[in-house]
Amino acid sequence: MLIIPAVDIKDGKCVQLVQGKPGTEQVVLDDPAGVAGRWESLGAETIHVVDLDGALGLEKNTGILKEITERVSVPLQIGGGIRSREYAGKLLDMGFERVILGTMAIENPAIVEELAGEYGSERIMVSLDSRDSRVVIRGWTEKVPFTAEEMARKFQERGAGSILFTNVDFEGLLSGFDLKPVSELVEAVEIPVIYSGGVSSLNDLRMLQGTGVMGVVIGSAIYRGLIDLTEALKYQDLK
């Protein structure tokens, strides 16, 4: 199980927000590329990058994203504001290993098939954010009438190589999470599932390991000192 530290970027800085809401910054650090490099130096094998400005439709972190790809050698996955096939391709060509498609994929599933055909399924991840057992889009503001399992099966057929599952009810709250929807999603598809949302302790990682997820994204907990990344990374070696 991969332990994947998150680097969320807003206004050129590395931040951590509560449930993704602007103005709720819990952590603000300069030099996002340096932060990513530190996580790599501690042993992270993949790093999760989110362009929070991009998620709001602002393409102003291109230079920082490029710097991260130049300073970090482990695989990078990037999400936030990917609203076109062209921009997804730009990020892949920039050096990101995987692009994470959210609202765009749900509103236009064919884009997943097109990008998978051009770049390979392994480089296309679809993000499914769930609230009250339904997938939400557009920055978690709009609910669609499908469960994460239903959507995941659909995108598997379209050629997605993996799924990022976020339980919005717990994201950024450091309050734990519900294992049941995670296990159900893993069982619903054959492609790998990565989980994000509410992880706040090493015990959480131990429990998630039993669900069969390929990896876990950790954000607030490592920035606020609740989880030591070095200790968390030991779970990568456990079977």
From Swiss-Prot:
GO terms for cellular component: cytoplasm. Pathway: Amino-acid biosynthesis; L-histidine biosynthesis; L-histidine from 5-phospho-alpha-D-ribose 1-diphosphate: step 4/9. GO terms for biological process: L-histidine biosynthetic process; L-tryptophan biosynthetic process. Keywords: Amino-acid biosynthesis, Cytoplasm, Histidine biosynthesis, Isomerase. InterPro entries: Aldolase_TIM (IPR013785), His_biosynth (IPR006062), HisA_bact_arch (IPR006063), Isoase_HisA-like (IPR044524), Isoase_HisA-like_bact (IPR023016), RibuloseP-bd_barrel (IPR011060). The keyword Isomerase applies. Its EC number is 5.3.1.16. It is an enzyme of class 5 (isomerase). It is found in: Cytoplasm. GO terms for molecular function: 1-(5-phosphoribosyl)-5-[(5-phosphoribosylamino)methylideneamino]imidazole-4-carboxamide isomerase activity. The active site is at 8 (proton acceptor), 129 (proton donor). Signal peptide: none annotated. It catalyses: 1-(5-phospho-beta-D-ribosyl)-5-[(5-phospho-beta-D-ribosylamino)methylideneamino]imidazole-4-carboxamide = 5-[(5-phospho-1-deoxy-D-ribulos-1-ylimino)methylamino]-1-(5-phospho-beta-D-ribosyl)imidazole-4-carboxamide. Belongs to the HisA/HisF family. This is 1-(5-phosphoribosyl)-5-[(5-phosphoribosylamino)methylideneamino] imidazole-4-carboxamide isomerase. It comes from Methanothermobacter thermautotrophicus (strain ATCC 29096 / DSM 1053 / JCM 10044 / NBRC 100330 / Delta H) (Methanobacterium thermoautotrophicum).
